[in-house]
């Protein structure tokens, strides 16, 4: 089964517009750091940046080319549809969801999450529902059939704007696994 990381990226943030391409230091911007971090994982080579069709996000495309990762453009408000169409186009059976504004995504945690996903075969695995990791280190993994079900059944605007809200609101419908840190440091904010 083909597995890929979809990195959700846009420049039109309300809290900090343009954050995705803001320079961190002389070595690169936030998106470059995110992608370079996740490239250190052991299991996945397919990385796709899923951005919007908005013209302001045209600036993201040269970064994807520079870093030699694929890109996909889709709906700016229906992020769930953007993910679904991206996963469908690239024939992904398993999707890892990362956001482009979290440069401290740890590839070792990503590796552990992927290994646990393959071992337990849940519909959805994350460090989001039962939080022990700092904010800004979110990793979510789900299979395409789960994404298809969510895409088909999510009706609320909040369930379309946020890719996995439907899963969190309907946990009884899914086999869910959690990754937890050895102690609870979820009070920290790394984003």
Task: Identify what each model region corresponds to.
Residues 58, 105-190:
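Conserved core of the sugar-phosphate nucleotidyltransferase
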Residues 29-47, 60-62, 66-67:
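A short, N-terminal amphipathic alpha-helix
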């Amino acid at each position: 089964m083909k597995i890929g990381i979809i990195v959700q990226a846009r420049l039109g943030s309300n809290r900090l517009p343009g954050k995705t391409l803001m320079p961190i230091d002389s070595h690169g911007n936030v998106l470059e750091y995110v992608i370079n971090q996740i490239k250190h994982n052991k299991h996945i080579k397919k990385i796709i940046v899923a951005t919007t069709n908005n013209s302001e996000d045209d600036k993201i495309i040269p970064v994807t080319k520079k870093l030699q990762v694929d890109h996909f453009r889709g709906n700016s408000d229906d992020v769930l549809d953007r993910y679904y169409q991206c996963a469908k186009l690239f024939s992904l059976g398993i999707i890892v969801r990362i956001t482009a504004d979290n440069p401290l995504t740890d590839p070792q945690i990503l590796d552990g999450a992927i290994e646990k996903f393959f071992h337990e075969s849940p519909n959805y695995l994350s460090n989001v529902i039962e939080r022990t990791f700092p904010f800004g280190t979110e990793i979510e993994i789900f299979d395409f059939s789960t994404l298809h079900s969510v895409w088909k059944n999510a009706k609320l605007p909040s369930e379309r704007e946020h890719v996995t809200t439907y899963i969190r609101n309907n946990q009884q419908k899914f086999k869910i696994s959690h990754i937890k840190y050895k102690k609870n440091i979820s009070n920290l904010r790394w984003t």
